[in-house]
């Protein structure tokens, strides 16, 4: 868990902002959301495979768009 030390003469809002930023960098909220409900290993693999396919399709579409001639 991210820990911050409140500096001297630092307002609460600034310290809270620093804490939120450190939580975001650590990926804490995403981890909590992922672990909120149990997900079967087969479902995890299926979701990851689908996201990989989507990523590849997106990259291929970008490359094809770059290689097409506009005239």
From Swiss-Prot:
Renumbered to this chain, region (Disordered) spans: 43-71
Q: Report the superkingdom from the record.
A: Bacteria
Comp. bias intervals (Basic and acidic residues):
60-71
Q: InterPro entries, from UniProt?
A: Ribosomal_bS21 (IPR001911), Ribosomal_bS21_CS (IPR018278), Ribosomal_bS21_sf (IPR038380)
Q: Which UniProt keywords apply?
A: Ribonucleoprotein, Ribosomal protein
Q: Which Gene3D superfamilies does this chain map to?
A: Ribosomal protein S8
Which portions of the chain have biased composition (kind: Basic residues)?
43-59
A Pfam family assignment: Ribosomal_S21
Q: What is one process in the GO biological process aspect for this record?
A: translation
Give a Gene Ontology cellular component term annotated to this protein: ribonucleoprotein complex
Q: Name one GO molecular function term.
A: structural constituent of ribosome
Per its UniProt record, what NCBIfam families does this chain match? Answer: S21p
Q: Give the protein family.
A: Belongs to the bacterial ribosomal protein bS21 family.
Q: Which PANTHER family match?
A: MITOCHONDRIAL 28S RIBOSOMAL PROTEIN S21, SMALL RIBOSOMAL SUBUNIT PROTEIN BS21
Name of this chain's protein? Small ribosomal subunit protein bS21
The source organism is Haemophilus ducreyi (strain 35000HP / ATCC 700724)
């Amino acid at each position: 868990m991210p820990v911050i030390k409140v500096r001297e003469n630092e307002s609460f809002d600034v310290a809270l902002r620093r804490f939120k930023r450190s939580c975001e960098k650590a990926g804490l909220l995403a981890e909590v959301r992922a672990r909120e409900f149990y997900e079967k290993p087969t479902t995890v693999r299926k979701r990851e495979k689908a996201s990989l396919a989507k990523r590849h399709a997106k990259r291929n579409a970008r490359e094809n768009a770059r290689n097409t001639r506009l005239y």
